[in-house]
């Protein structure tokens, strides 16, 4: 994983010089080399600027970052050790950069400092906001002399590297491992810290081995780890959120753009640099990489929408990340060939195929987030549904994604939760509720779970109701759907239908409940005026009870409850289709 991220950073030229980090500058204090006491404030933008950074040393009371630092350090209300360190660094930089010397000189003038504070207050620059300097319109962090000076100056303030050489886990080269790896940013929305989270962290004795301390337990070079950080920072920034996790994905190489129908499809917004005022990159390699990401994103989209993805000759990498206690939690890491991924996605879409709940073709495609909602208990007008997904589904979502992308088995929790969703939705006594059938997307979870976890299901479990299915529980569900339809035909204005009253008990103990429903059916059939429908329902019940067999199951386990739900669902859809076909036939004859 680390090596793949490093390769991504090298390919995109994302790695920064040693000791550099990307920062956002809120405001620039502008000076003039020609006009004394000239002070203006120029507001920054949201772009992250590569700047020198001394890392954890800046967390102490004596040292600070240089060039770009918080207002409380650069322009303090009272002089302190950190502000003195900042100004002294400008003095030393001033030996090779005249603009830095001018800034250091101005910062030693108390009258000008008061003027600067007033300007900062007017522009509402807070003590925690990062600021920097401009001289005659030149930004100090863009100085051509800064990098070479920084390499030498940094060696004087950084503690000497101790320890033996060790092979870097990322590159394999011998290196003196960094004591503390840089933090990864962008996970705040999924439980991380605003200041970043540690990907490699050995701050507790229990995490260490063989007497090694800190990051020496996972030795990485400063340059290689900086590249990994740059790659993750970029990938995380535009990664979608799924159940409280960042869905990060990338590919190992470019693909040919020729005859690429997916080039303009861009799920995460790449390829729009020209629309943001930046010069568009005409380099073939960059365009191919955009094409690869576009095609790759379309693959992920196909998981959600059911569309077919095109061929891509590349290796995919997928990370599910969240932040916990200041650390990066890798929930799942997947990699593999794209052709295999495409086959598994096609299998996923085939397994999902299920009749529409009201016989209007097959169920419509649904985004993966919408499907995952069917694994939560139903709550009407739930405004915190996504918070619930983050809390309740973060544990099984990685396993679900692995099953989708790898073509494997689904966790049993999927079937348990889908059944719970169906029951909870039926129990909502809502006068405005018009759904008589079960939720189609929840039943799709049950169908896929049965197909993948029980091999004998594949032969008999189809998109539509199968009258020859060998499982009695399947036909028990179909029988209940018929009883419910008979009740609806006899008493269309009833407030609580049969499914709402008896479904939860019938799916667990069908032998106890179906007998009672059969007795009620006699009363309901007598209320139906049309002999045609009476005979139709009797014939349906006779066929279904013949399929159940001589003994109705006493209790149903998880597998058979899933069959029960699908039998109910598919029989209801079948009756709806038969009714629509009859109406259409009567219209044609008329």
Where are these regions (language model features)?
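Residues immediately within or flanking Cys/His clusters that coordinate Zn2+
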Residues: 162-165, 196
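Short cysteine-rich clusters marking metal-coordination/redox-active sites
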Residues: 165-173
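Beta-strand elements of modular eukaryotic interaction domains
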Residues: 159
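Extended alpha-helical scaffolding segments
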Residues: 1-156, 175-590
């Amino acid at each position: 994983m680390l090596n793949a991220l490093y390769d991504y950073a090298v390919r995109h030229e994302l790695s920064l010089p040693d000791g550099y980090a990307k920062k956002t500058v809120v405001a620039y204090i502008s000076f003039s080399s020609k006009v004394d006491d000239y002070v203006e404030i120029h507001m920054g933008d949201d772009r992250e600027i590569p700047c020198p950074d001394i890392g954890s040393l800046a967390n102490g009371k004596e040292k600070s970052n240089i060039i770009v630092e918080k207002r409380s350090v650069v322009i303090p209300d009272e002089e302190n050790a950190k502000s003195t360190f900042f100004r002294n660094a400008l003095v030393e930089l001033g030996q090779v950069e005249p603009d830095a010397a001018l800034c250091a000189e101005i910062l030693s003038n108390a009258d000008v400092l008061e003027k600067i504070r007033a300007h900062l207050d007017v522009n509402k620059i807070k003590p925690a906001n990062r600021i920097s300097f401009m001289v005659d319109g030149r930004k100090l962090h863009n100085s051509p002399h800064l990098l070479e000076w920084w390499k030498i100056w940094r060696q004087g303030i950084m503690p000497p590297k101790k320890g033996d050489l060790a092979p870097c886990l990322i590159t394999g080269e011998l290196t003196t491992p960094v004591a503390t790896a840089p933090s990864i940013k962008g996970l705040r929305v999924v439980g991380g810290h605003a200041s970043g989270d540690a990907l490699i962290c050995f701050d507790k004795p229990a995490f260490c081995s063989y007497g090694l301390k800190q990051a020496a337990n996972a030795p990485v070079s400063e340059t290689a780890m900086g590249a990994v950080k740059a790659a993750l920072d970029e990938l995380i920034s535009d990664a979608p959120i799924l159940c409280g996790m960042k869905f990060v994905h990338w590919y190992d190489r470019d693909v040919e753009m020729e005859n690429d129908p997916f080039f303009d499809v861009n799920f995460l917004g790449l390829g729009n640099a020209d629309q943001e005022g930046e010069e568009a990159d005409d380099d073939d390699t960059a365009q191919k990489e955009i094409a690869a990401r576009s095609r790759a994103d379309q693959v992920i989209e196909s998981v959600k929408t059911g569309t077919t993805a095109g061929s891509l000759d590349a290796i995919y990498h997928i990370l599910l990340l969240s932040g916990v206690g200041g650390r990066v939690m890798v929930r799942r890491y997947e990699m593999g060939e794209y052709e295999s991924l495409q086959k598994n996605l096609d299998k996923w879409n085939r397994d999902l195929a299920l009749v529409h709940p009201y016989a209007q073709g097959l169920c419509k495609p649904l985004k993966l987030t919408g499907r995952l909602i069917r694994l939560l208990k139903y709550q009407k007008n739930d405004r915190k549904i996504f918070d619930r997904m983050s809390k309740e589904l973060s544990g099984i979502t990685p396993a679900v994604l692995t099953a989708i992308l790898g073509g494997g088995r689904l966790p049993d929790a999927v079937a348990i939760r889908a059944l719970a969703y169906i029951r909870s939705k039926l129990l909502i006594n809502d006068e405005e509720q018009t759904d008589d059938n079960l939720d189609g997307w929840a039943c799709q979870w049950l169908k896929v779970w049965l197909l993948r976890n029980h091999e004998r299901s594949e032969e008999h479990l189809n998109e539509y109701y199968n009258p020859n299915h060998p499982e009695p529980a399947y036909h028990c569900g179909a029988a209940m759907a018929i009883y419910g339809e008979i009740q609806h035909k006899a008493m269309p204005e009833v407030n609580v239908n049969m499914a709402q009253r008896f479904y939860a008990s019938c799916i667990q103990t069908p032998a106890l409940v179906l007998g009672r429903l059969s007795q009620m059916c006699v009363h309901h059939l007598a209320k139906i005026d049309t002999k045609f429908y009476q005979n139709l329902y009797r014939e349906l019940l006779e066929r279904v009870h013949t399929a159940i067999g001589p003994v109705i199951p006493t209790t149903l386990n998880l597998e058979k409850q899933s069959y029960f739900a699908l039998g109910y669902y598919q029989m209801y859809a079948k009756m709806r289709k038969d009714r629509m076909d009859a109406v259409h036939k009567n219209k044609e004859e008329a």
